[in-house]
């Protein structure tokens, strides 16, 4: 399948058309952004790590009943995917308090959330992805009620799968974001799962092993990404 012109350039990935109208190529760049793209830095190997990390996780989810857009790993930093009609609603699930939740509610970072908290955000960088609820989705026709329920079900299912995968390797899955789209009128998991869109802490030390290392000037960003990948079994060779 031939790679064609650029379709979309995001903060850390570039999407390309292909010679088949139903498929795209995701290119994972070495860019890493914070503050809704206002600050972008580059780290060697980052695109490769996230591409292979994402491919590994998406396949694990697909094996356990979650439909994903993943088709084929093409190279160190490229993956062939289904072309989805993306839904502008992000599903965030939180197993522990961190990030914006701590700031909004004034609760202690690391507080265990039982049951896990599922939040919805309107995907819009210029408005800093405001938090919304199901009523917003209906009123503004962001996603149908049926599809929203399906997205929430799949997010909870993914959380059940992923918390076990990471826990077995000594990692706490603190929270993560998922994005969905439509393919042949079916809800499909799209975008990516990587340390860019999740929070991951070491179980023993609570060391942060995700993009918070950049947000909080902790250093060792790529080293942390690589350690998580290797622990859970991602082949980086």
From Swiss-Prot:
Keywords: ATP-binding, Ligase, Nucleotide-binding, Purine biosynthesis
EC supergroup of this enzyme: ligase
Single GO MF descriptor: phosphoribosylaminoimidazolesuccinocarboxamide synthase activity
Pathway as given in its UniProt record: Purine metabolism; IMP biosynthesis via de novo pathway; 5-amino-1-(5-phospho-D-ribosyl)imidazole-4-carboxamide from 5-amino-1-(5-phospho-D-ribosyl)imidazole-4-carboxylate: step 1/2
SUPFAM superfamilies: SAICAR synthase-like
Reaction(s) catalysed (UniProt annotation): 5-amino-1-(5-phospho-D-ribosyl)imidazole-4-carboxylate + L-aspartate + ATP = (2S)-2-[5-amino-1-(5-phospho-beta-D-ribosyl)imidazole-4-carboxamido]succinate + ADP + phosphate + 2 H(+)
EC number: 6.3.2.6
Keyword Phosphoprotein annotated: no
InterPro entries: SAICAR_synt/ADE2_N (IPR028923), SAICAR_synt_PurC (IPR033934), SAICAR_synth (IPR001636), SAICAR_synthetase (IPR050089), SAICAR_synthetase_CS (IPR018236)
A GO BP entry: 'de novo' IMP biosynthetic process
Stretches assigned to coiled coil: none
Entries under CDD domains matching the protein: SAICAR_synt_PurC
Source taxon at top rank: Bacteria
One Gene Ontology cellular component annotation held by this UniProt entry: cytosol
Family named by the database record: Belongs to the SAICAR synthetase family.
PANTHER family: MULTIFUNCTIONAL PROTEIN ADE2, SI:DKEY-6E2.2
Name of the featured protein: Phosphoribosylaminoimidazole-succinocarboxamide synthase
Organism of origin: Baumannia cicadellinicola subsp. Homalodisca coagulata
Gene: purC
């Amino acid at each position: 399948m031939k790679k064609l012109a650029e379709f979309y350039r995001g903060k850390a990935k570039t999407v390309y058309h292909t010679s088949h109208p139903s498929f795209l190529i995701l290119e994972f760049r070495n860019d890493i952004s914070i503050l809704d793209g206002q600050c972008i830095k580059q780290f060697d190997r980052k695109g490769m790590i996230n591409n292979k990390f994402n491919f590994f996780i998406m396949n694990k989810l697909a094996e356990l009943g979650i439909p994903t857009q993943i088709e084929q790993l093409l190279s160190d930093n490229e993956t062939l995917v289904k072309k989805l009609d993306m839904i502008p609603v992000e599903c965030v699930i939180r197993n522990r308090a961190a990030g914006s939740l701590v700031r909004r509610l004034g609760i202690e970072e690391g507080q265990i959330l039982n049951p896990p908290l599922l939040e919805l955000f309107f995907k819009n960088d210029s408005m800093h992805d405001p938090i919304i609820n199901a009523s917003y989705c209906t009123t503004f026709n962001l996603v149908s009620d049926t599809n929203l329920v399906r997205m929430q079900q799949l997010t909870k299912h993914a959380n059940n799968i992923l918390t076990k995968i990471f826990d077995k390797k000594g990692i706490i899955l603190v929270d993560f974001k998922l994005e969905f789209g439509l393919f042949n009128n079916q809800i499909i998991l799209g975008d990516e799962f990587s340390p860019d869109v999740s929070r991951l802490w070491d179980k023993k030390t609570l060391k942060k092993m995700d993009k918070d290392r950049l947000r909080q000037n902790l250093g060792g960003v790529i080293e942390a990404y690589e350690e998580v990948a290797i622990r859970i079994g991602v082949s980086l060779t």
